[in-house]
Amino acid sequence: MDYSTRPDARILYDTLVPIWPDRGSALSYRNCFELLIAVILSAQCTDEQVNKVTPALFEAYPTPGDLAEASLADVESLVRTTGFFRAKAANIVGAATIIARDLGGTVPDTIEELVKLPGVGRKTANLIVSVCFGKPGIVVDTHVLRTARRLGLAPTDDPGKS
């Protein structure tokens, strides 16, 4: 069944949009590259904490090429307070390296290309294609998926199949 055309899904959508018309991100960013890096850093961290870290990070490394050339130790020290800082530093340097080296410095505009980047899963990819490129994409975390499943709007708890 195509869940996007269910009448109850439309009712839910039509009810929620007026309540939350501005569904933008709480993360601070100036371009798609900054949003991508901020979203990677936001895993298991509050947007508020990410917003405290990113100004210094983007001042030091404003482009994918700059971040790709950064020492891992320097990036780790800048993102330390976001938790899991070693993995996050490796992921953002890795993503920046691929973007700079293989993609001409441009953030990919498809989910398929985005999920190839270190630290990027479907949730992050959907957010980027939706916010940056205006393409349809629904950002679904475990809480949204669980609620959608309980409401009968999602057929499974598997995010890849919902």
Q: Where are the language model's segments positioned?
A:
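Catalytic cores of DNA base-excision repair glycosylases
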Residues: D2-S162
